[in-house]
Design a protein with these regions (language model features):
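P-loop (Walker A) phosphate-binding loop of NTP-binding proteins
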Residues: 12
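ATP-binding Walker
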Residues: 15
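Hydrophobic anchor at the beta1->P-loop junction of P-loop NTPases
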Residues: 9
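ATP-dependent small-molecule kinase phosphotransfer cores
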Residues: 38-107
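Conserved phosphate-donor/acceptor-positioning beta-strand/loop module used by diverse small-molecule
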Residues: 100-104, 118-138
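Walker A/P-loop
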Residues: 18
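Small-molecule kinase domains that catalyze NTP-dependent phosphoryl transfer to phosphate-bearing small molecules
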Residues: 142-231, 237-239, 246-249
Length: 258
């Protein structure tokens, strides 16, 4: 049974996940974000209906009360000790329109448990060290009690998420190079939608791989290993088990070229 793939991106505050996702959606129209509802104010560089649907808290409450079965995720983020915080909510109709969703770890588990029979939920964790995230916050003039509070709130949640390997893929953005991160994540996504990593383990059972799937696999490997050959002293973007995946995919490709 075919399931639509939903790529769920998770990462701590200022990890770069929003920038990575936005650049990928600009590069390739096969990818589009799930537009959630939020009660936070719209920023100057945002457009209603693009980044979010900007609504008030009453509208979000109304959706939750009248359409509870349509709610796929809900998050409330406190800004400081004196604030009631902002709310974020996503509905199943918005999930049907997009295939990339920026979400928190708890939201992924909820999606898998409630909608796993409808969607293939693929979790991608963007890991960026705290020092780099703190530097970004300072550069963007939002290094305030808000950032410190969010870091504190996220530490337990993401530590559990990381230690128990709730993700499918993890990108280590060690030195904070977003351009390289975009290249790697884009290669990974095109590889997956072409059938790549998710079907490697069944290749021995006689799966027939299309030219498109082989091309996507080669493209992904080329992008990853070209980067490493040109930047072999860097520790940026270490994809887990990449050498093993390379050998598996290489053997699959060679078998089709015989």
């Amino acid at each position: 049974m075919y399931k639509k793939q939903i790529f769920c991106f998770v990462g701590e505050t200022n990890s770069g996940k929003d920038t990575i996702v936005n650049k990928i959606c600009e590069m390739d129209k096969r990818f589009s974000t799930v537009v959630s509802y939020t009660s936070r104010p719209k920023r100057d560089n945002e457009t209603d209906g693009v980044e979010h649907h900007f609504v008030d808290s009453d509208t979000i409450k109304d959706i939750m009360d009248k359409r509870p079965d349509d709610v796929v995720a809900y998050t409330k983020i406190s800004q400081d000790l004196s604030s009631s915080g902002y709310e974020y909510l996503a509905t199943i109709d918005e999930l049907d329109k997009g295939n990339i969703y920026i979400i928190d770890p708890h939201g992924i588990e909820y999606l898998r448990s409630k909608f796993g029979d409808i969607y293939e939920i693929i979790a991608i964790y963007i890991y960026t060290p705290l020092e780099i995230r703190r530097k970004r916050a300072k550069n963007r003039s939002d290094y305030t009690t808000e950032f410190a509070k969010r870091v504190e709130n996220e530490s337990v949640q993401f530590d559990h998420y990381y230690r128990h390997k709730k993700y499918d893929y993890i990108i280590y953005n060690i030195d904070g190079c977003l351009d390289a991160a975009v290249t790697t994540v884009y290669g990974l996504l095109t590889y997956i939608i072409g059938g790549g990593l998710r079907r490697e383990c069944t290749s021995a059972l006689g799966n027939i791989y299309t030219k498109k799937e082989i091309y996507d696999g080669l493209t992904y490997l080329k992008m990853i290993f070209t980067y490493y050959l040109n930047n072999f002293t860097s520790r940026t973007l270490i994809l887990e088990d990449i050498q093993k995946k390379y050998e598996i995919m290489r053997n699959i490709i060679l078998s089709h070229l015989k």
